[in-house]
């Protein structure tokens, strides 16, 4: 906190490690252990290190013996988990990221979890790892947000439409080539229809994570496409999440390769231009509240070009993308804009003004490029 950072813990409440002390007690004492009902035991003896094809005799996450599943129906387990929840918030943690919370199929537990969290810190952030649409958990009585994989596929499919690695598959993140602007618009608008707008401002928007290939790998190392995808992520409603190492050009396939250590000892390997790009777009988002909590509306979606508006309390920004590999021109109607004069905010260093004529704001964009414009004081006639 002294460094203006907030820390969110990863809470794994569905299962534990094989070294968890109540599980050790159960292994040592069997049915005589007071913790026998903390787990889902099939029969004794338990086999924490089963041989091939042997049943460990207890429920485990994905049948992995080293990850015994907790019996969250047991009052002792519930009390312990809620004690842990409160303990770390009182210690000073700022929220919880919940691992596989859908596997604890108990809304009452999560409602009580929320009450404990918000009682300790009303500003604490609760974000669940739910890959699919999560209306059940986002009604205001359980989570604040989820890891928003619903935005991941549309962003990759649009900005990587001509050069996407399709060798990775997941039922909740559909990747495909050939996605145009209109389909991108439809997917994003369908995502926005899932929840109340207050939820979207809190959603953990991500391009990749420890559970999937890195963004650059999925884009076949196309750094121009990556920059557009990141710029889109940073200008959409939500809380953008950067997976460590993406900002220096780390590229790897799925688990475990995507989890390799950050190369602290090899700074010469880092892509410093890409790192500076990340710093710039993050600074841009921080500098303009409209990009964080402004309203959102598409202005244009045609071919491989997209434009949308972010607006808040008199500030209007227009974000424009050309995802194709050739130059493209677009025209925006001033009927949906608040001004006829716009200043270029992005790319940085371009001290240019764009002016609308005859009800149209005409823009020319190079291949795989973007513009961010800020409305001037002159109002449209």
Language-model features, listed with the residues they occupy:
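Active-site clefts of carbohydrate-active enzymes
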Residues: 199-219
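Conserved glycine-rich, hydrophobic/aromatic-active-site segments
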Residues: 228-230
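Hydrophobic faces of well-ordered beta-strands that scaffold small-molecule active sites
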Residues: 7-9, 96, 126-128, 147, ...
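Carbohydrate-interacting/catalytic domains
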Residues: 237, 242, 248-381
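Active-site-proximal helices and loops of the catalytic beta/alpha 8
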Residues: 1-3, 14-15, 20, 24-31, ...
């Amino acid at each position: 906190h002294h460094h203006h950072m907030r820390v969110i813990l990863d809470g794994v409440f569905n299962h534990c490690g094989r070294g968890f002390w109540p599980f050790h007690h159960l292994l040592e004492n069997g049915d005589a252990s007071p913790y026998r009902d903390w787990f889902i035991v099939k029969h004794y003896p338990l086999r924490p290190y089963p041989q091939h094809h042997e049943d460990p005799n207890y429920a485990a996450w994905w049948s992995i013996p080293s990850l015994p599943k907790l019996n969250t129906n047991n009052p002792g387990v519930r009390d312990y988990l809620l004690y842990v929840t409160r303990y770390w918030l009182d210690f000073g943690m700022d929220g919880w990221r919940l691992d596989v919370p859908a596997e604890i199929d108990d809304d009452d537990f999560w409602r009580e979890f929320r009450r404990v969290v918000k009682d300790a810190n009303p500003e604490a952030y609760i974000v669940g790892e739910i890959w699919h649409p999560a209306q059940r958990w986002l009604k205001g009585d359980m989570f604040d947000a989820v890891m928003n994989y619903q935005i991941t596929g549309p962003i990759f499919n649009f900005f990587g439409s001509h050069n996407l690695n399709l060798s990775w598959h997941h039922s909740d993140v559909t990747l495909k080539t050939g996605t145009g602007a209109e389909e991108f618009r439809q997917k994003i608008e369908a995502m926005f229809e899932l929840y109340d707008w207050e939820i979207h401002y809190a959603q953990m928007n991500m391009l990749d994570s420890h559970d999937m290939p890195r963004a650059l790998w999925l884009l076949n190392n196309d750094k121009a496409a990556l920059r557009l995808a990141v710029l889109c992520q940073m200008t959409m409603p939500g809380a953008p999440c950067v997976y460590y190492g993406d900002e220096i050009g780390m590229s790897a396939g799925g688990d475990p390769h995507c989890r390799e250590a950050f190369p602290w000892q090899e700074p010469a390997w880092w892509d410093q231009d890409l790192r500076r790009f990340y710093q710039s777009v993050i600074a841009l988002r921080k500098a303009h509240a409209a990009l964080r909590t402004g309203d959102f509306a598409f202005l244009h979606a045609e071919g491989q070009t997209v434009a949308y508006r972010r607006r808040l309390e008199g500030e209007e920004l227009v974000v424009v993308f050309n995802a194709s590999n050739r130059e493209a021109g677009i025209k925006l109607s001033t009927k949906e804009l608040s001004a006829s004069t716009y200043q270029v905010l992005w790319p940085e260093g371009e001290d240019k003004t764009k002016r609308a004529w005859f009800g149209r704001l005409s823009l020319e964009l190079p291949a795989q490029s973007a513009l961010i414009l800020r409305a001037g004081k002159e109002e449209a006639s």
